[in-house]
Amino acid sequence: GQTIAFSYQGDIYTVPSSGGKARQLTTHPAHDTRPVWSPDGQRIAFASNRSGNFDVFLMNKEGGEPKRLTTHSTNEYPTTFKDNGHILYLANVLQDAKDIQFPGTRFMQVYEISTDGGRPDLYSSLYMENIALSKDGSKLLYNDYKGYEDPWRKHHQSSITRDIWLCTLGKDRSFQKVTTFGGEDRNPVWAADGASFYYLSEEKGSFNIFKKDLAGNSEKQITTHTTHPVRFLTSDNSGTLCYSYDGEIYTVKEGQKPAKVNILIVADKIENDVIHRLLTDGATDIAVSPNGKEVAFIARGAVYVTSIE
């Protein structure tokens, strides 16, 4: 819990959980995202499209050249470490023939791959988002994915909103639904006691952090943000929660007030603030201003305004 990994402008950074100057770990012009810590805190898995589509890469916590672990032609995203030597990730390689959406490419499966690389193994044909494994490895929490709803849409309630499930692992896996709100419940993480969990829910308005026991009872609200939704919930072994709110990173412990992590990023811009282009054709939907001195038009998918002169 001493260091936070995050993505900013397509690169992976780390910063002390107490705040301070961020350290840039990746510098590739491709998009690097979704960092995930190994249990021992020594390595970080992340997704990058530096080879075309998104693949799973692994690097040391100090940075350096990352190692590419997956090579499938579809996108692959790390979700959690199974242990220090294995990563669980999402991919759409071979959909289960029993799936109601078969054949299709929308619903991903969960695969397992060694940190040394090699051939991946199918971990679950069921689409499990935001997997959180228990410390003893006997259970996992996840949120389901039932349909094509935009994950950034706010306050909707429908038959395809996400719910939290508890999966007991073993030869015959068993599943228990632990949230029943008609809106969005997602992003579960284990509490330090191993008998309860935190998660994000819109039950009281915008996304906030809530807590329940594994039976789905004893609901308790942890944060009370109102203006914007809480996103990207994670936790460390001691029960400190970390999340994003309004473009900033916060930490909180149950019973305490959230604290913003003050981060200093010293980096060059990857794009120019203003891009000058000479357009000689392709303008559509032209509209002259009421005073006749300006004209608005569409070009290359953007709206432009220019002087008649």
Residue ranges of model-derived segments:
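Non-catalytic extracellular/periplasmic "stalk"
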Residues: 259-263, 271-273
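Signature of short aromatic-glycine-proline-rich micro-motifs recurring in repeat-based ectodomains
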Residues: 278-287
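A flexible loop/linker signature enriched in serine peptidases of the S9 family
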Residues: 2-17, 24-33, 39, 45-57, ...
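Residue-level detector of Asp-centered blade-edge/turn motifs that repeat once per structural unit
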Residues: 39-40, 82-84, 135-136, 192-193, ...
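Short, surface-exposed amphipathic charged segments that create phosphate/polyanion-binding patches used
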Residues: 236-238, 276-278
